[in-house]
């Protein structure tokens, strides 16, 4: 197929749009940055894209709660299009604020298939903004964005958030997430073992750092792969200057998946 087409969906307060755009372009996708208004007024259509990227930042200033207003705008006019987009097997990725939006929309974890909100990303257990590089373990590489990683592989990725503590509506939802291996990314310490704060920077239940839906085409995570697409943007890049940044494999996995599928 020709290069997969991706849209980086923005609104007031989002950030890292350019990092996401360049990551997609340099992984072989055709990408553009699109304001949510263009989808709301039908200037653009979701059906014209193979991947939607919901960027990080503080959409609408994170008023009410993180991601709530952006999710409300999507629900008002675009929710059926988004649901069809996912059902068709096309890809959605949301780091940080994007993850918060996906949770609000019910696209993740969506264990009952009802597109209802089953979880939340609450205030960090430290009650402060956490911004640093952390260790992440890949638990399941069946997700379209993780195919270039090995299960059990330990990654170093940056975080920057105030509301990242993953909690579920009830024990049943959490049990479904764990039994279906939807907890594709976990916070770990430098030895690759699950631990508490500060290794788990927000106090997420079961050290969950990222979720993928059961279909494998929607990924939400608190870390920012787009910030470490290039080797020189990694915090310890002077220790090993060879190869690509860790984020590169997230985007290459997605582009290769789309080329194979479509």
Descriptions of predicted regions:
Residues 1-95, 99-109, 114, 122-130, ...:
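N-terminal beta1-alpha1 cap of cysteine-dependent amidohydrolase-like domains
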Residues 2, 39-44, 82-84, 118-262:
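Amide-donor transfer/coupling interface in amidating biosynthetic enzymes
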């Amino acid at each position: 197929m020709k290069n997969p087409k991706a849209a980086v969906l923005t609104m007031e307060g989002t950030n890292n749009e350019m990092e996401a755009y360049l990551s997609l372009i340099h992984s072989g996708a055709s990408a553009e940055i699109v304001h949510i208004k263009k989808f709301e007024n039908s200037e653009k259509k979701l059906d014209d894209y193979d991947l939607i990227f919901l960027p990080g930042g503080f959409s609408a200033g994170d008023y009410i709660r993180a991601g709530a207003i952006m999710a409300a705008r999507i629900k008002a006019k675009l929710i059926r299009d988004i649901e069809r987009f996912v059902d068709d097997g096309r890809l959605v990725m949301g780091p940080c604020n994007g993850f918060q939006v996906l949770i609000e929309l019910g696209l993740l974890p969506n264990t009952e298939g009802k597109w209802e909100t089953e979880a939340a990303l609450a205030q960090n257990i430290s009650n402060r903004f956490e911004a640093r590089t952390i260790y992440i373990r890949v638990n399941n590489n069946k997700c379209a964005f993780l195919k270039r990683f090995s299960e059990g592989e330990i990654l170093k990725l940056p975080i920057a958030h105030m509301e990242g503590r993953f909690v579920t509506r009830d024990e049943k939802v959490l049990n479904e997430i764990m039994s279906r291996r939807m907890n594709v990314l976990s916070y770990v310490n430098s030895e690759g073992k699950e631990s508490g704060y500060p290794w788990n920077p927000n106090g997420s239940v079961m050290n969950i750092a990222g979720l993928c839906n059961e279909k494998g085409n929607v990924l939400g995570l608190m870390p920012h792969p787009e910030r470490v697409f290039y080797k020189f943007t990694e915090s310890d890049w002077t220790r090993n200057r060879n190869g690509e940044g860790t984020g590169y494999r997230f985007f290459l996995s997605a582009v290769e998946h789309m080329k194979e599928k479509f």
